[in-house]
Design a protein with these regions (language model features):
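Bacterial N-terminal signal peptides that target proteins for export
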Residues: 1-8
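Bacterial N-terminal signal peptides
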Residues: 8-16
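Flexible, solvent-exposed coil segments and beta strand-coil junctions
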Residues: 30-40, 86-95, 159-166, 196-201
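Outer-membrane beta-barrel translocator domains and adjoining extracellular loop/strand segments
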Residues: 39-45, 82-90, 139-148, 206-211
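Outer-membrane beta-barrel transmembrane domain signature
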Residues: 60-68, 78, 98-205, 220-222
């Protein structure tokens, strides 16, 4: 009980200190490592993108007494995905291995609601919840089919597709627009910031799966 009282008192003092802090707007530029995946496979494909993100965010103070901020900005993500379909059957007359090499470029508009816990005049911990809208600018894949006969290489077929265009039955391989949510936390020390976040989409990228996303971010505030 005594420990609980101490914790409650510490939180109260921290929040009270926040009320007297001067809350100003800010700008932030970030670079991020971004990993996207889906837990549901399709046609034995494991979707697993790795990429880099470039962000600009503007923080708007929502209150003079409470360090609550609304962040609005833009994000470019350049990513790639290498997937493999099927496995070689050395006993079969005909067998094949299909490799997919995909490249993506997306432009997103993230909106975050942040609360700045100011530890001292140099250090802040900033949890946030956000929403985003995103569009694919570029999405292409190269398909390499390696054909074998009794385990011996026979031939190779190479094709390239624009995933944003209709290929079969007027159905696109990937949707142009997407939207989702994210939750995370940043640690700011002086003008430098480091954070991690996780999120997933509201809209399925294709008809039967939704991408999840993790990002680790390093940024500079000014």
């Amino acid at each position: 009980m005594k420990t609980l009282k101490i914790i409650v008192l510490a939180i109260t003092v921290l929040l009270a200190g926040q009320a007297f802090a001067q809350n100003k707007g800010y700008n932030r530029i970030d670079v991020s490592y971004v990993k996207a995946w889906t837990g549901q496979s399709e046609e034995n494909i494991i979707y697993d993108r790795n990429g880099v993100g470039f962000d600009y965010m503007h923080g708007i103070s929502l209150s003079k007494k409470i360090p609550l901020f609304l962040e609005v900005g833009g994000r470019f993500i350049l990513s790639y995905d290498k997937s493999e379909i099927d496995k070689l059957d050395e006993t079969a007359l005909f067998s094949s291995i299909t490799n997919l090499n995909s490249r993506f470029l997306t432009l997103g508009i993230p909106i975050n609601l942040c609360y700045n816990f100011r530890i001292n005049n140099k250090l802040e911990i900033i949890p946030f919840f956000g929403l985003y809208a995103r569009a694919h600018i570029f999405a292409k894949t190269e398909i390499r089919v390696h054909k074998y006969s009794y385990g011996n290489f026979h031939s190779q077929d190479i094709r390239e597709y624009d995933l944003l265009k209709s290929i079969d039955k007027n159905e696109k391989y990937i949707k142009l627009f997407n939207a989702g949510w994210t939750i995370g936390a940043n640690v700011r020390y002086k003008p430098f910031i480091f954070g991690v976040n996780f999120g997933t989409g509201f809209i399925k990228t294709r008809e039967n799966y939704t991408m999840c996303e993790f990002a680790a971010t390093l940024g500079y505030c000014f």
